[in-house]
Amino acid sequence: MADLKAFAEQLVNLTIKEVSELTEILKTEYGIELATSSSVATGVSTSVVEVREEKTSFDLILKGVGTNKLAIVKLVKELTGLGLKEAKGIVDNAPAPLKEGITRNEAETLKKSLEEAGAEIDIR
């Protein structure tokens, strides 16, 4: 079963060029008709293109607060613009989303600030 999963993972991660080469190998070495192999290749290459589109919107998730909870609450309040009660609610309910739909750069900057204060952060 593990071998099949590894094989499936390799297929999903093929580039368009590799799919084209695979199509040619299936045609020449195994006699699989071009129409059959090209429709398979088209389906695979469409999936590959969709999977490899770069993500532009990220969510910042507070996973844990460490030992300095008060500093994290203050920092969450400052970085999100929330009130003290709302910021404390997020910290108390970790894991919880801090900011959603932000850029990669903003997410990395906020993550660095929060981790320096002792928080455990995840970017999704």
Swiss-Prot record:
Keywords attached to this entry: Ribonucleoprotein, Ribosomal protein
Name of this protein: Large ribosomal subunit protein bL12
Transmembrane segments: none
Family membership: Belongs to the bacterial ribosomal protein bL12 family.
InterPro entries in the cross-refs: Ribosomal_bL12, Ribosomal_bL12_C, Ribosomal_bL12_C/ClpS-like, Ribosomal_bL12_oligo, Ribosomal_bL12_oligo_N_sf
Any GO MF annotation of the entry: mRNA binding
SUPFAM superfamilies the record matches: ClpS-like, Ribosomal protein L7/12, oligomerisation (N-terminal) domain
One Gene Ontology CC term in the entry: cytosolic large ribosomal subunit
Species annotation: Azobacteroides pseudotrichonymphae genomovar. CFP2
Segments forming a coiled coil: none
